[in-house]
């Protein structure tokens, strides 16, 4: 085969940075190769590459690729009282990274190990982030053993005695920049050591090269020194480490009040390990720290870390590794973890501390990152006598339930986890953790396996772990083992014994240390299930009074409780939440309505609670949580509940448990002396009662508003306020671990309310009034008659209550999963909410640490709102039925809905008549509405004189900033979708395809229109020649439906939908009844088959993953801008910073009030935040971090007028999205039945007869947007501005409006009115800048080859070979884009045979088209074959290896994601989620991780080896064949949809054998060849997984021919 010069060079440059001067024997490659390599490094950072000459700066002309390509030869090593956690502070630091370690099993220190770690670090630069200067890294670092040779050399030169390795501690210290402060800090440090009896041997200034540091990092760079101390009073190694730990804690306490306290930081203080780190790019770490270039720096291991932080403000201490851990991930439950650790401070004791526990507090720091706090807790356990592996198992447990291997082979491991489940809440979230105490080095993965981790071992006794393969040059013949860490797995290297322990070996060793199983049997008890009550406990009048008093509405009962009782699931609704925020409403609201659920986006993924429930649990333990530092049977003395939702009998069981000593606290307050101050006083009394009860030994506090008879002057305290206040009070007084809180309440009936109570401290809830309402409903005459007449499914009274609780539990799992949290025990007290409308007084009392940006109600005002419900139950004219507040459905006299019938009618009149007067009436209607959104509290102002409107930019310019929302073709009809697209194209705006692809017929302008009709689009009217129905914005959503190479290359912009305003953190499902033949064709599925979109993108589990997808999309379509859609919530600014650094062109902020075709009511009402706050935070954060000019800011959510546009512009938005109102202008009548497929005007229906009623024409929407633009122009003229550019980011033109709200006058708008400055560029300049580039890429080299370009242009066949490295990402994506643009997805008749050798970077072979035959000899990272539409992709290991290919992990996670065609053959194992959302791809592999074939809708997958758990979850189409040689497959398959059967159909046998034959031919697989040789023996060992849509296919139906013949006979007979 012909080979390009790049591939032919024996020492082609490698991307590991020129981290160190190369050994003299190494060839120095300069010139073009070095420059190209430098440019490649810059593009790996996600920035536009500068001129190559500039890129070469700091490299010294040395090619880094030479490092990887040098022949490697191992040589023998030379022997020689704190406040609660505050969400604002926590959210300011989020991150992700690339990590790894190198370890020598002989424990022989070597400079080569350090060198290899730095090389690997340089090869993961693309996994890190940089600041706005493109030079200051987010952080990188290295942990190693202490380089004693280096330090003794220094000691010798200083005239000091040699350092004693057994009792010398070394501290790596960041000191204040100011010289005087530094000396003061050093004096305090030295004094603490001296006072502790340690001898300070000296200080060493760490040598560094400041010239390589970026500007931002240099400005904040500390003085970096090392301190050496002698520990004379201890001789045990662990005691020495403990003494050094105590000293560090004492130093922190001694310097706490110093002005320079935040500038003093110990990176490490140990006699075993040391950490070098900083705000540096990975490639310059070794250049900055000159020690790392010194060959005397020798260590038997090294952990390395590259950070990608969403916060770009340089903070040197937050670089990693930390003192024990290197963490790639995010802890979702951090606020709760910190609060619980604070609660433990009073009870943590251990003999090893010799009574000095009080000196090492606190154990957490809210100002530090989640990684730093996890490290701190792990270090506490380690210094208290736990091993690193045990500490990790306690803090980050695996999903041990539903784990057949553990339950059968390792029950002691399950006992260990069950024991600690009640002692330590899991630190939950995606995490790859590397750890070392200097004796053990290891790595573990979170329970969901949401970070990549590969490992390999060599014959010369080295073990490597890394986020990616290919980061270190390797002689493959020496590799004896290749593997990957799966969910919850661990690997450790014992440096003292040379043992490598893999997963269950580690855990069995730890779990066998104590008899945890017998302790559990001895002390832990469970509540036995208690039957539900079978009769009502109250009469109808009493129930009604209770419902009125506690805030129920008829909607709550009929649409929520009764639906849950009858169906066992949450009610679904549609459109968005268009009512006022609770604090702005004139109607009374329950306290729960002031809280919005937070959710995962970008930095961590949501979870699918339906298809991945095996990793989730609602179990909770009740009782005292004792001393975590000691073990024993008494710690297991608790009660286990299977869920937090109790019926009356189960609550009674808890109350009868004498060991718990339960105390019931009444939650009423007395208003006989007036309301003012009464609620505050009652809360204080309640907290005092709780305090006394716990001090007297109570382990269970039951807060109850249950009463025999309600009293008019004794209203109930809002139960959420009571729970939160007691929870916070007990934390502050060190009592929280001593008791659990249970709520016995009438105030809880929706899943959101349960979640709030649990999130603020309740362990369980008994919703007695909701259960009574279920009983009353079931026994009502209306319900009985409906069931008797068959109009409602028959349920018993017990079943109604069981259904209700089932729905609550399902809803709780969904709420947890939105945030990526798996365990209710971790969610409890984690405060995963944002508050809208409560003042600081209320927040500090009960919700301390939660974000409440706009202030709001005082305690007295909250008391008045509570009382407004209560008095209705006792007034003389009390209604005989519950009031309908109209919170869900618009109704006369109910709550105001922005999308109301009158508004729709006025807008229809204006756009259909093209009447300025009618639009003015529409404007007046909006202006006269009640306060509905935050911007209604603001008005525009100007110190300029008005100008003639003729001087203002034209409407045609303004409308170019308008976009419509991403509405999928499937959720809405084809007519609506196309009419909107045509309208937006006419005005130069942009429509959005939504999920589901696009018909290619829409990509060409119409030229056949007569009288408004076109044969091309016969279902539309009002057309014009030249119209195009394409959507300028093509959406890439989690399901990847319709995402093909041709779809992407025909996009002007590509939107990555991370979240949707109406249901953030959730996926979706298009019901089978909406999947018509047309929809199925576009989505590469079958008609009538339900199509599931996962909650997360399965290639976006972190910020660096998002950067990779952005890279992939820029790769296939370098002309399309990439936008990322986020939903407003606290912390969105830091997320947006990360998105900007990830090379996005556009960031879209969506408000909570956006529309949806279908969503649970609780999500519509209680998730996401106002776009005003989200936009302000995003704009200001980007300005502060110097990133605003990089991205266009787009905002949407409830836009209806030009005033909305102007408000958004003043807050910083460049472009503006319209969703629901665009549908209304096109014909929507707001019937709010989108989710039923029964839209009366065919806007949101796939039913042909309803679609025929569609009234809209594109011109209506054109008219609307021109009206809005003219409104903008008129207002700009009044304000004295000539163009929108002039006001963007100008918050100074906003002022608070004088509005008298019904509930409070304490709304604080300063957050919206504050300014961080203006961008350096105008909005028009930002919008018109070029698409962000990936920089030089390997695909450009491929396309530059004349043979390949000729083959593409003239459809010929060509064969080529190229070298590939892990920094070569999305390889072949650009080539595929060129082919797709020219020939479409199936039109290329040529053939490109391209072979790569080496280790491929992420997304290898993405978006392949037919005619591309790609072969990789080596290995690959994650996302192989992503989005491929055709072609062939083969991955095989190198010919000479030291491992068995079928046992080795050859490719990474999430391969074949969203494939719509082609074949993949992998000789070896793949990672998690192989073939996730595969549509039509075929594949053969030799083993997979968990979740294989998840959400698959078509195609065929063959696995010739073992698979992980949860196979075929959500699989609605396609077939899978899995070889089950050891009879272990059955419990691993998710049988909710698919059925398992042997391969009996002849067509199925032919399909299976044919694929294996092709596989063997392409890969040379010995395993495959053996199967074919012994076909008759192996065939019975295969299982076929068949979803319902494939049951009648010839491959699955053994009697297909007979059935077909019978059907033919039946048809013939009928004739």
Curated annotation (Swiss-Prot):
Task: Outline where the chain's transit peptide begins and ends.
Answer: 1-52
Q: Which residues bind [3Fe-4S] cluster?
A: 1228, 1234, 1239
Q: Which InterPro entries match?
A: Aldolase_TIM (IPR013785), ET-N_metabolism_enzyme (IPR050711), GATase_2_dom (IPR017932), Glu_synth_asu_C (IPR002489), Glu_synth_asu_C_sf (IPR036485), Glu_synth_centr_N (IPR006982), Glu_synthdom (IPR002932), Ntn_hydrolases_N (IPR029055)
UniProt entry keywords in alphabetical sequence: 3Fe-4S, Amino-acid biosynthesis, Chloroplast, FAD, Flavoprotein, FMN, Glutamate biosynthesis, Glutamine amidotransferase, Iron, Iron-sulfur, Metal-binding, NAD, Oxidoreductase, Plastid, Transit peptide
Write the protein's name.
Ferredoxin-dependent glutamate synthase, chloroplastic
Fetch the Gene3D superfamilies from UniProt: Aldolase class I (3.20.20.70), Glutamate synthase, alpha subunit, C-terminal domain (2.160.20.60), Glutamine Phosphoribosylpyrophosphate, subunit 1, domain 1 (3.60.20.10)
Gene name in the database record = GLU
Q: Does the keyword Methyltransferase apply?
A: no
Catalytic reaction(s) noted = 2 oxidized [2Fe-2S]-[ferredoxin] + 2 L-glutamate = L-glutamine + 2 reduced [2Fe-2S]-[ferredoxin] + 2-oxoglutarate + 2 H(+)
Q: Which cofactor does it need?
A: [3Fe-4S] cluster; FAD; FMN
- What class does this enzyme belong to in the EC scheme? oxidoreductase
